[in-house]
Swiss-Prot record:
Identification of the protein by name: Conotoxin Pn3a
An example Gene Ontology molecular-function term: toxin activity
Domain comment, as recorded: The cysteine framework is III (CC-C-C-CC).
Keyword vocabulary terms for this entry: Disulfide bond, Neurotoxin, Secreted, Toxin
Record's subcellular location: Secreted
GO CC terms of this entry: extracellular region
Function text: May act as a neurotoxin. Has no activity on mollusks (tested on the freshwater snail C.retropictus).
Protein origin, superkingdom: Eukaryota
Free-text tissue specificity from the UniProt record: Expressed by the venom duct.
Cysteine pairings via disulfide bonds: 2-16, 3-12, 8-15
Family according to the record: Belongs to the conotoxin M superfamily.
């Protein structure tokens, strides 16, 4: 994972998907 859980929700996708 290159992003934090919160970051994923703010538009850090598709990092955490």
């Amino acid at each position: 994972g290159c992003c934090h859980l919160l970051a994923c929700r703010f538009g850090c996708s598709p990092c955490c998907w």
